[in-house]
């Protein structure tokens, strides 16, 4: 049985990843899903075998993931938190660091701490004109994800790039 880790398991992309894993691997997939928000004791991420609540940057959350398994066939990273709604050019180093704290920085940490065959991160198109005026510091986090995708590492890197398209 292969282990699959989904960070951001309650969001649209994370829940879609869980459904796709189930559809492709069925009961042979052991899905561990992380979520963070207002804690709801007893809450289970739909389709996951194990639900881990917590901020992925917290060492206790990492230990909870390791307590299930240290070896994963696949990790899907679909969580983000950062400043949007202002022009990208107005993002300060502090806002970028705050955005990266959850939106990018945990990815290489997870790669180094766990044995993961492939990591797929989720990005969006952030360089089209109408996004440049509203994507704020988050654009830098998405850029970091895309640059990381091209780097070699312990795991295979991939990125799903989705979003709005210019017509």
Say what each PLM segment does.
Residues 95-100, 117-154, 163-167:
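Catalytic loop of short-chain dehydrogenase/reductase
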